[in-house]
Amino acid sequence: MKVLFGGDNRIFLPNDTRMIGTFIEGMDELIPNANGNLQYVHFKYEGQQLLKVYTLKHLYADDVKIVTATPNVYWMTEGTEKTDIQIGDVVRFNTYDKGWKVTDITDTVEDAYSIEFANGSRSIIVEGFELLIKNEV
C-alpha cells in the first residue's frame, strides 16, 4: 500500500523531528507506530501530486493542525475507521484524545513522498498524529 504525504509534513521520532524529504529513498527507515514500537518503512519522492489539505481544530483547546495527505489515509471517527471524512467530522488520534473537528478540506498540488510499509503495519505518526493505513487486499 502506498500513501502520499506533502513534502512539508514532519515525522516525529522519539528524540527527533525530521522532514520526510530527509529520508533516503529506497532505504529501510525505522519510525514509531502508535504503540511506540518501531516499524520499517520505505520513502520515495513521487514528484508533484494532487493531495488533500485537512484543517483540524481541537474541540477544547485553542489549537489548529493542518495535515496534507492522500485521501486513502484512514481516520478514526467515533471509533470507526473511515477515509471519506467530511467537514464537521470529529477525528481522534488515540483513546485519550478529546477530538479534532475537521473545519476545512481543500486540494493542493505539492511535492509528495510515498510511504511504503515493509511489514504490513497499519499506523504512522505524521505531524504528531496517528494516521491509520490499510493494506490493499
Write out the residue ranges for each language-model feature.
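Autoprocessing domains of the Hint superfamily
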Residues: 1-137
